[in-house]
Every structure is written in C-alpha cells, then in structure tokens.
A protein has these predicted regions:
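Long, histidine/aromatic-enriched segments associated with O2/redox biology
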Residues: 1-167
Length: 167
C-alpha cells in the first residue's frame, strides 16, 4: 500500500487544516492543461491518494475497504480505479505487454534494477525539496478514455501514425 499527499493536505481553500502548509513541496503544483483535455472535476485533485497493489485483486480491494472503514467520518473516497495485469516492463527479463489498443506499452520504462536511472528520474534527491521528501517520489494520475470500438475501426497505418510506432 502506497500513500500520496495532494496539495489539499497542506493548504486547502487558504486553510492550513493540519499544520502542514510550511511542509508542502514547491514542486507539488497543478499540472498544465494539455491540448484536448476534458478533465472532470470529480476526478481531479484530492488530498490523499492510496494505491494498493497485489497479485490478487481481492487483497488490494480488501486493503482499501479496511482503510476507508477506519477513516469513516474523517475522509471519504472521491474516486477509485481498479486496474489489472502488468502494465509495464520493469525488469530486463520481462516482455513488454500490449495496452488495450494492441500497442506495446512501457518498452522504454526505467528498469527497477537500474539504480542510477531511478535516482536521476524517480526518487527525490537530497536538496530537491523538503527533507521529508528525500527518497520519495511524485505521482501523476490522468484518467483517459480509451475508445476501443472507435479505435478498432481505424486503419492500422493510421493507428501507427497516431501512436508513433509500429504495432
């Protein structure tokens, strides 16, 4: 189980609810808009992120259920997303899986055993933010719509042009 804190944990509507405003990392800021964004407010921002991973989805769901039960009356679930399967290649012996559009996804991901690359691109280094963030990381989540039925009607050559690589 991984926990992440959104900007609202530090300061929300100008109120320092938990005495943490002075500990907010400068880098924790709203993302700029992307061309074609159709973001929905109910799936945007938030104070706390919980990611529960398991080889058995029932274990992950049960963990989140227990946490939400404990937090009843103090916190509520704004939105949840169930995931499935390995969605990226993280070790040299893994094959790159295909996404729902049929394209390999994650081929260029940083490998879990490449400590230098992880230190450079994933983990917060000493001096790159508040001391409590050293060794931590940032998470960005964007819900996207994958219109598979529409995609399946697009010619292969056009799909490859859109994605920027061959299938």
């Amino acid at each position: 189980v991984t926990f992440g804190f959104g900007p609202g944990m530090f300061l929300k509507d100008g109120v320092d609810r938990f005495g943490l405003a002075d500990r907010r990392p400068e880098q924790l800021a709203p993302l700029p808009a992307f061309l074609g964004d159709a973001l929905q407010a109910e799936f945007s921002h938030g104070d706390l992120c919980i990611q529960a991973c398991s080889s058995d989805p029932q274990v992950a769901v049960h963990a989140v259920r227990n946490l939400s039960r404990i937090a009843f009356g103090k916190a509520n679930i704004r939105w949840a997303q169930l995931g499935f399967g390995r969605t990226s290649r993280t070790t040299a012996d893994q094959q790159t899986p295909r996404n729902l559009f049929g394209f390999k996804d994650g081929t260029a991901n940083i490998l879990a055993d490449d400590a230098a690359a992880l230190d450079e691109h994933v983990w917060v280094a000493d001096g790159d933010g508040p001391d409590w963030m050293t060794g931590g990381t940032y998470l960005v989540t964007r819900k996207i719509a994958m219109l598979i039925e529409t995609w399946d009607r697009v010619r292969l050559s056009e799909q490859e042009n859109i994605v920027g690589r061959t299938k």
